[in-house]
Amino acid sequence: YRNMIGSLLYLACWTRPDIAFAVSELSRFVSSPAEQHMIAAKHLLRYLQGTKDLGLKYSQPKSLSPLDASNVLWGFVDSDWAGCPDTRRSTSGYVLMLNGAAISWKSKRQSVVALSTTEAEFVAASSLVQEVIYARRLLSNLGFPQTKPTAVFEDNTTCIKWAEGAVGGTD
């Protein structure tokens, strides 16, 4: 089971972001897997077999000019709230895109217990923003400075207002 999860983690990290959440959940049971965890892991392997033609596909942008609009970063972020029945911790997920392709993604259990959906979403959004800062610096060092703000797509309106500094308190 441990070797299987290690291989699945490799795939989730490098070529198959679509399995990141499932692998994250399965990896919680590496130290003491039950039969149901092995069944779920094998189900994930069958999914991979059936979708082996899927994966990240990168294409060259129309222009390699740093001023080209296609060289703009954008990200999507979401979170559940208290999704873990044992710890009541939430799970964050994000994907950072460049030229229509995912360049960074993560699905991870939050280290804090959020007291509201807004707080869980804000923790998730802050993780994405940290990754955006890193990616913008990296792209700038590679000669592709980001001249426009990075759009972050978030579905919780109170979280968006918090990020804009328009609200204090929780929902």
Each predicted region: which residue ranges?
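Divalent metal-binding acidic/histidine catalytic loops
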Residues: Y1-D171
